[in-house]
Amino acid sequence: MIRVGIVGFGTIGKRIADAVAAQDDMKISGVLKVTPDYEAKIAVERGFKVYTLPDGLDKFKKAGIEPAGTIEDLIEASDIIVDASPEDVGRENKEKYYIKFNKPVIFQGGEDADVAEVSFNALANFEEAAGRRYVRVVSCNTTGITRVLSSLMLNGIKIKKARIFIARRGADPKEHKKGPINDVVPNPVTVPSHHGPDAQTVLKNIDIVTMAVAVPVTIMHMHMAYLELDGSYTKEAVIEAFAKTPRIFLADVGAGFQSLAQIIEYARDLGRPRGDFPEVAVFRDSVTVNGNELYLMYGVHQESIVVPENIDAVRAVLGLAPKWRSIEKTDKSLKLITEGKRYG
């Protein structure tokens, strides 16, 4: 059984830890926390060994948490590391620790692409991560983009160019110091936003431009996409592609899905941990084909969309399973929607 160490136990790290714990071919060797807060105590209650930085050992002991060791001890106890640190900290960890230990590491999309050898999305380029030392799972928005575009391309729908407009959530639900509160902020004001070039690190030949604004919500991002297709395709063919592809959910207005809030409420009603929705929620009614032009809207749950990607990245790097077997295994273990999906 593969031993996975999680560096960072915040919004993404704690979700990845729970996902690893749900697998039958990997287990948590431990998690790294810098602060002995409630999340650290929850990690202990979950049965995870908690590690910290060398200068934090006494701080944890005073808080009543006996650390299992330092970050170097965690790396030594692991076959692979998933670094879910805040933005840019992953690169610092690489230079300070990971290079020395020469073990594979999965980074997150908050890091620049050059931190890793490969930027990763399971549907798009699973095989490229095989045997790599450093792999980066792209950000939530980029994961949403690459997943939607890959869904079409895997089903024979060719894309000439993509123009995607993103309404980014202003903050995660627990982030009390971020915003905006009463504003719409170009994020960035320049074109393109970083999401398009980031998507090109995975889908290297795609012609894509993105624009983004930050809006005063916390639940999800909304993408509005215009795609120019290379050929003539029907609306039915596009919808069938989404219906068959794993990690895509078709939300119907007639079934009560009129907003992103209702997507999250659906996740809660399903009993999903933390109300997570790792699937991309494509609004079926928005899918419109006009000649070779395709229009659609879809929601991206920023807290959870990358979680299954990280599990697949571990398998891809270590060669634990081929692409479709890994994706199916991950989806079933995390209780994602698998009915009607085609794995292969």
UniProtKB/Swiss-Prot annotation:
It is found in: Cytoplasm. Keywords: Cytoplasm, Glycolysis, NAD, NADP, Oxidoreductase. InterPro entries: DapB_N (IPR000846), GlycerAld/Erythrose_P_DH (IPR020831), GlycerAld_3-P_DH_AS (IPR020830), GlycerAld_3-P_DH_cat (IPR020829), GlycerAld_3-P_DH_NAD(P)-bd (IPR020828), Glyceraldehyde-3-P_DH_2_arc (IPR006436), NAD(P)-bd_dom_sf (IPR036291), Rhodanese-like_dom (IPR001763). It is an enzyme of class 1 (oxidoreductase). Coiled coil: none annotated. D-glyceraldehyde 3-phosphate binds at residues 139-141, 195-196. Pathway: Carbohydrate degradation; glycolysis; pyruvate from D-glyceraldehyde 3-phosphate: step 1/5. SUPFAM superfamilies: Glyceraldehyde-3-phosphate dehydrogenase-like, C-terminal domain, NAD(P)-binding Rossmann-fold domains. It catalyses: D-glyceraldehyde 3-phosphate + phosphate + NADP(+) = (2R)-3-phospho-glyceroyl phosphate + NADPH + H(+); D-glyceraldehyde 3-phosphate + phosphate + NAD(+) = (2R)-3-phospho-glyceroyl phosphate + NADH + H(+). Transmembrane segments: none annotated. GO terms for cellular component: cytoplasm. NAD(+) binds at residues 11-12, 110, 169, 302. The active site is at residue 140. GO terms for molecular function: 4-hydroxy-tetrahydrodipicolinate reductase; glyceraldehyde-3-phosphate dehydrogenase (NAD+) (phosphorylating) activity; glyceraldehyde-3-phosphate dehydrogenase (NADP+) (phosphorylating) activity; NAD binding; NADP binding. GO terms for biological process: glycolytic process; lysine biosynthetic process via diaminopimelate. It comes from the Archaea. Its EC number is 1.2.1.59. Pfam families: DapB_N (PF01113), Gp_dh_C (PF02800). Belongs to the glyceraldehyde-3-phosphate dehydrogenase family. Homotetramer. This is Glyceraldehyde-3-phosphate dehydrogenase.
